[in-house]
Amino acid sequence: NMGNEILESFLQHGFTSAGYFYDDVNFNKGFPTEEKVVHSIRQQSEAVYAILLYLKYEKSQGRKHTEWENHIKKILDGFIKLQKKDGNFARKFHDDGSDIDASGGSTPSATSALVMGYRYFGKKQYLEAARRTIDYLEKNIISKSDYFSSTLDANCEDKEAAISAVTANYYMASVTKGKERQRYIDLCQKAAYFALSWYYLWDVPFALGHYAAAPFHQLHLFFVDADD
């Protein structure tokens, strides 16, 4: 019941005038005015992804949510308009679609949402837009091993960009065949190897009370973040 109430609340209050999800709401100050709305392509994509999983489950149970479907289609149609000529998406944008942060490193976040939209709605434009994101990723990110701009806060190099690239190519491989599919598998593998480089083995002492403290000479596997 609580989950349904949350979703119903989003239907009533969770969308901007342009049809996107509100990324951030301060309930002490109220909803941001239209000119102060800031959207992140990652947050919008992850929200679409989550709702499509919900809709897929509901559909399997014989339940249909037309209003939700219309909202998600509107957002995905908006993605097609937001996409640049080279296939990338601005990291952050205004409600009217104009760029706030034009960096394209968050582009793979949109790939998975577009592929899921294609599988759910059967709209080929979503798949074509997803294909173009991979063209951008291969040329500007994966081939250069320069994974950046996928965090929600800082615009920096980070493991999240590599993980997003892995996921994007995995999803593309799931809906394609032959040489095209193999291309995505190869790119997925390259990005996965880079993501692994953010993991290190440490054999060093840590101060007592530190979350990593353990007997000296014991090997630890730690996740190393750009913020650490």
Give short role names for the model-derived ranges.
Residues 1-228:
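Glycan-recognition and catalytic cores of secretory/periplasmic carbohydrate-active enzymes
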